[in-house]
Amino acid sequence: MIEVSGVSVRLSGKTIISDVAFTAKAGELTAIAGPNGSGKTTTMKAISGELAYGGSVRIGGDEVKGLKPWQLAAIRGVLPQASTISFPFTVREIVRMGLTSGLNLHPDKAEQTAAAALASVDLTGFEGRFYQELSGGEQQRVQLARVLCQIAEPVVDGKPCWLLLDEPVSSLDISHQLTIMTLARNFCERGGGVIAVMHDLNLTALFADRIVLMKSGRLAAPAASFEVLTDETMLSVFGLRVRINQVPADGTPFVLAHSAVSRP
């Protein structure tokens, strides 16, 4: 379980997020959604230990601030937002960077782990290609394969591991969006946990168990089932007039936007 309690982050004297609190459970995919600039990425960086924070973040009962980098690397893998940074390395070299927390792996085992991670994101055969030659979507999948090298199993020594994914499908075509979200779903079903920043609410409703809505650096709604997606909430958080239907087969909510409205 990841417990976020009263978390605040200040950068350059400015409060970016304030009093964020929710719980994410192993075996579930928890989504964080909200408008641009609402504090989603900052929240993820606090949870992962990348940013100093006030309040408390506990993974499996351990305070993140008290864990050493190698301890964090053993229990959580982080996929940052897609970036335009160019790495002068091959795909194989980047993916195997995820193995730095397991340097004692036999070379054959390391190669097998990297190959399995690449296969899971549909990049078999890309091992020798240079990162900067790839499309944005391919680069995003390479970075996810690196994370899957680091966290190859959802449960280690009886304790769940976590994938912290910041917009994992933002650059992907629909086919690979479904591939990656299915992979995340399977990770949860095997005992691990996933927290993912998402923008597509319909894709989120299809794969996530719970959703946390943020606005202006604060929670707009607690981690809850998708009953929180009401017309009123969507208008308040996103400034959109919507109609929320349900998929007849299973009742999954489906958001249809009417029009944008002026924000206060």
From Swiss-Prot:
For this protein's source organism, the top of the classification is: Bacteria, Pseudomonadati, Pseudomonadota, Alphaproteobacteria, Hyphomicrobiales
Q: Which UniProt keywords apply?
A: ATP-binding, Cell inner membrane, Cell membrane, Membrane, Nucleotide-binding, Translocase, Transport
What is the E.C. number?
7.6.2.-
User: What's the superkingdom here?
Assistant: Bacteria
* Protein name stated in the entry: Hemin import ATP-binding protein HmuV
Q: Tell me a GO cellular component.
A: plasma membrane
Q: Which residues participate in ATP binding?
A: 34-41
Q: How does it sit in the membrane?
A: Peripheral membrane protein
Give start and end of each ABC transporter domain.
2-241
Subunit text? The complex is composed of two ATP-binding proteins (HmuV), two transmembrane proteins (HmuU) and a solute-binding protein (HmuT).
The protein's predominant localisation is membrane
Alphabetized Pfam families for the sequence: ABC_tran (PF00005)
Q: Where, per UniProt, does this protein localize?
A: Cell inner membrane
Disulfide bonds listed in the record: none
